[in-house]
Amino acid sequence: MTRGSDRPRLYVRFAESDPAAAEQRLAQMSAHKAHLRNEDGVPEGFRILASGPMQAESGGSAAALIIAEARCIEDVMAFSDADPFVIHGVYNRIRILSWTPTLSRISGLQGD
């Protein structure tokens, strides 16, 4: 996908939590949530469709998932890089991938 494409695509950010960063998670939680909800200053065509933590069997947060619509992966990467959880090392691994749903029962997401 090239920068500036007219047609938004879907992207998934999968961020694995660093168990040693529990204090930073707590300290940055409000700023992280504000970042996810803030629509000011995001690139045109960028919007979060769904987000939330993924729980480990032990009950702690193991990872977090964001499904976003954007015109290019660079916009998703820039949004992710500005996330307080990313800035303060709450995640130890982040993957951002283009996603093409082939089956969806989520309202508004259509499969190819």
Task: Briefly describe each language-model feature range.
Residues 1-112:
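Conserved, structured core segments of small domains
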